[in-house]
């Protein structure tokens, strides 16, 4: 791997003369250029007029910040003149049909984790590229396994772009001097087993039994069935959690729970599908607990599903608890439960 290999050079080598791959290359290049501009905005913060103030709510009911709106427009402007059949943004209610005869469709979350803006924590952009179906209106009513490419950008201490074209996962870092992304991690592999988990533990009382039982196993540490101690992480930014898992392994859980409006978890089109594609391409797993995320065919642009992703053995253990109820019941038995820090 050359430290000087740019994203453009990498994409040129992948695309060749194939028209479909050429379209993907152009879209990824445009998204990367947009990411540089968004990175500039996040770095300047209040100096660029970014206040983190709410601008209302988007289609999904999430509070929409000023940078959400600006990031959305930057990406739309970057993609608008390319051979793209349709665009879908988390910030918009409906599909934006551009050129139905074009070979690809692009979905994106322009600014994941925007609630972190005021606290100077990591935010990011997530994207998914699909082939155009015969009915362009069904562009994102396809299984996640149909994706041609997926990626995300983390705007943190460094700006990193994670990309899969369905043939492994690469990481590119923004060289601010040249304003281009350069390859810094090739064929990334997630450790098969790790002792970190990420979940918003304040919602424990709302989780279903398998999730509670799994987290209690982790908290029992070396004294429990896992036989080792675990660390908990929670940043509140999906892109930051995913990047850490790519580097160190572990498991991320955003389960559906009993709270009104939170029964179903993360957005399929804008979050779960692209993240699942990336994680699987890096040797990890992504599941709802009962079903592989990439097998899900969403029936709407803003459908949600529980999202569990990370090191394959960790994910498989939680899947086992969902599919074999007695395992979760046994793990939640009083003798074991007394060891859990969250038992009430």
From Swiss-Prot:
Gene3D superfamilies under this entry? 3.40.190.80, Fructose-1,6-Bisphosphatase, subunit A, domain 1
| Chief location category | cytoplasm
Location relative to the cell = Cytoplasm
Q: Does the keyword Cytoplasm apply?
A: yes
Under Enzyme Commission nomenclature, its number is 3.1.3.11
Broad enzyme group: hydrolase
Give GO cellular component annotations, separated by semicolons: cytosol
Pathway note:
Carbohydrate biosynthesis; gluconeogenesis
Query: What does the Swiss-Prot or TrEMBL cofactor note state?
Result: Binds 2 magnesium ions per subunit.
Q: Which Pfam families match?
A: FBPase (PF00316), FBPase_C (PF18913)
GO molecular function term, any single one? magnesium ion binding
Q: Give the binding site residues for Mg(2+) 2.
A: 109, 112, 271
Gene Ontology process terms (BP): fructose 1,6-bisphosphate metabolic process; fructose 6-phosphate metabolic process; fructose metabolic process; gluconeogenesis; sucrose biosynthetic process
Alphabetically list the UniProt keywords.
Carbohydrate metabolism, Cytoplasm, Hydrolase, Magnesium, Metal-binding
Reactions this protein catalyses? beta-D-fructose 1,6-bisphosphate + H2O = beta-D-fructose 6-phosphate + phosphate
| Cofactor(s) needed for function | Mg(2+)
**Binding locations of Mg(2+) 1:** 90, 109, 111
Tell me the residue numbers annotated for binding substrate. 112-115, 200
Q: How does it assemble?
A: Homotetramer.
Family matches, as NCBIfam families:
PRK09293.1-3 (NF006779), PRK09293.1-4 (NF006780)
The family classification in the record reads: Belongs to the FBPase class 1 family.
Q: List, alphabetically, the HAMAP family matched.
A: FBPase_class1
Q: What is this protein called?
A: Fructose-1,6-bisphosphatase class 1
Q: Which gene encodes it?
A: fbp
